[in-house]
Amino acid sequence: MGRPLLNRRLAAFGTTIFAEMSALAVRTGSINLGQGFPDSDGPEEVREAAVRALRDGRGNQYPPGPGIPELRTAVAEHQQRWYGLSYDPDREVLVTAGATEAIAASLLALLEPGDEVIALEPYYDSYAACIAMAGGTRVPVTLRPDTTGPHPAFRLDLDELRAAVTDRTRLILLNTPHNPTGTVLTREELAAVAELAAERDLLVVTDEVYEHLVFGTAHTPLASFPGMRERTVTIGSAGKTFSFTGWKVGWVTGSPALVSAVRSAKQFLTYVSSGPFQYAVAEALRLPDSYFHSLREDLLAKRELLAAGLAEAGFAVFRPSGTYFITTDIRPLGETDGFAFCRALPERCGVVAIPNAVFYDHQDQGAPFVRFAFCKRESVLEEAATRLKGLKVS
C-alpha cells in the first residue's frame, strides 16, 4: 500500500512512554515508579460497594448514557460540599470512562479544525493526541523551573500566557494540580486565567483529577471564579482520589450548554462504561472528611520519604505541592539526557522512571528532568531509595 495506514493527525504519536517503561519494568523486574498507579487498593467499603452492585445486578447492563443518577447526584454534592459550586445532576454532570475520555470528548466537541488550544507545558501526553484528533493546534505555555527560592518549583509566566492568545485561540486546557511538575496554581494565577478568558472570550477545559492530592494548600476550581462557571468544563476522576485507577470512572461538570456539547461527542466514543463501578464511586464521593485528610497525610509522608531518598542519591528535587509525582533534575548526577537515563535506569539499579521530555513539544526543554511516582507502599519506596543510592556521583 502506498498510503500510510495511520491517520496523519496521529502519525507523530507512537507507543506511549508509559507502555514502553512499564514493559521495561516487567522485563527487568524493576520497581515501577514511572506510571502513576497505586500498588494497593483504595477503601474496602468502596470495593465492597462494587461487589454488591455486581451481585445485585445493578449496572451489569448498559447504564444511562449520562451516567447513573446516583453518581451524577454524588458528583454534584461533592462540588457543593468542597467548593460551594452548585450543579444540576441532570443537566450539568456527565459521567465518562475516566478523565482521558472526558478530555477527548471535550476537545472533540468544542474545537473546529485550526482552532488553537493553549496548554501548560509539560503536559500529560494524551493532551497533544486529543488536540490533534480534534484537528486543533496546540500552543504550549511552558512552566519554568525556578530554583531561586528555598523551595524549587515550576512556575507559570502570566505574561507568556497572555502573549500566547491569538485570534485563533478557542480554549485554554488547564491542569492543576499539575502533572508532571506538581505545581498547584495560586488563586492569583487562576484569577488571571479567568480574567484573560473573559477578556478574550475563551473557553477553558480544566483537568482537576488531583484535586484532593494537595499538600499545605487548598485546591481552588477555576469554575469558582466570577464568570467562569459558564465557560469552564471541569474534569474529575475517581481513580486518583480513591486508588481505583482500573475502574475508569471520570466526570465532567459545567453549564448545560457545555455538558450537552461534550455529551454529543462522548456518546460516540464509549457511550457508556463501568456500570457497577459507578454505584461504588457514588458511595466513595460521600466518604467522610477524615478519608480525604488521611489520603493527603499518607501521600505527604510518602512524598517526603521518596524526596529524601532522591536527594540523598544526588538528584535535584522539586517537591510537589500536589499530585503524587516528583520531578527531579539529573544534571547533578552528571547526566543530561532523560530518555537515555530512564532507559538505562532499570539495568543500573532496578528502578523505572519517566523522562519529562515526552511532556514537551520542544523536548530539549525537558531533557534533564525525570519524574518519579510516590503512590506506592512505603516499603517499596524505601527499597527504591536504597537502590537509587548507587547512582550518586562520588
Q: What is each model feature region?
A:
Residues 7-98, 105, 157-160, 284-287, ...:
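N-terminal small-domain helix-loop-helix segment of the aminotransferase-like
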Residues 28, 134, 199-200, 313, ...:
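Helix C-cap/helix->beta junction micro-motif
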Residues 109-131:
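Conserved PLP-anchoring active-site segment centered on the Schiff-base-forming lysine
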Residues 139, 143-216:
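Active-site phosphate-binding strand-loop segment of PLP-dependent enzymes
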Residues 162-163, 344-353, 358-394:
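PLP-dependent enzyme catalytic core of the Aspartate aminotransferase-like
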Residues 225-261, 273:
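Active-site PLP attachment segment
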Residues 262-266, 284-309:
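Structural signature of PLP-dependent enzymes
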Residues 282, 298-307, 317-330:
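Conserved glycine-rich beta-strand-loop-beta hairpin in the small C-terminal domain of fold type I
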